[in-house]
């Protein structure tokens, strides 16, 4: 099916509502319950410096891109069993597309 083209502004709203309590996106942003996501695209799982990842995240060994994020964000615990991310996921493909569009722009 592919990743739907997303709307950055809608994605930003989703991030604020669903992600910002645990993640930051800006360069040099602090880790919260979840890691800072700056530089996410092109980074391997479990690689944000200074964040204590689960072994499951470190061992997954995939590189974050549109396709891997699209699958992960639907159901994080299914994609990486053992992750400590408590987010249930975004079931609607267009919402995942919007969030990915935002993450691509906000984490460069």
Swiss-Prot record:
Pfam families: Cytochrom_C. This is Cytochrome c-2. Binds 1 heme c group covalently per subunit. PROSITE patterns: CYTC. The keyword Mitochondrion applies. It comes from the Eukaryota. GO terms for cellular component: mitochondrial intermembrane space. Keywords: Electron transport, Heme, Iron, Metal-binding, Mitochondrion, Respiratory chain, Transport. One of its GO terms (molecular function) is electron transfer activity. One of its GO terms (biological process) is mitochondrial electron transport, cytochrome c to oxygen. There are two cytochrome C genes in Drosophila: Cyt-c-d (distal) and Cyt-c-p (proximal). Belongs to the cytochrome c family. Electron carrier protein. The oxidized form of the cytochrome c heme group can accept an electron from the heme group of the cytochrome c1 subunit of cytochrome reductase. Cytochrome c then transfers this electron to the cytochrome oxidase complex, the final protein carrier in the mitochondrial electron-transport chain. The gene is Cyt-c-p. Heme c binds at residues 19, 22-23, 85. It is found in: Mitochondrion intermembrane space.
